[in-house]
């Protein structure tokens, strides 16, 4: 149960307001797919912290610190876009989530699966080699002065 007196509502509200303006930029991991009622990561981090830290710990002081709650397991049986699961993992807790909608389960699994950096870059470079020439062919225009075809950089 959360304690209203310990919850840093003023501080979290300021962060949450900014996060809510452009969720897909501020917390892109939870926005790989359109989802109903996406929750703000900053709010859920604060809620989870309040539930996990000692009663005498200031939740706001703990907000930006690195934590190891490996002795805690968080269950979210209605995980939706996975905000609770993602924030619990960031806090070093174990997390278990499920949802009646299989798309939710698939999306959250993809969001939270670690991809080795080199594998990601190799795949990106392969895609660039294979499809970039065709895609770039659609981004050309005629230079009004010279009449020659030039690449379009900005619209």
Model-assigned labels for residue ranges:
Residues 1-155:
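S-adenosyl-L-methionine-dependent nucleic acid methyltransferase catalytic domains
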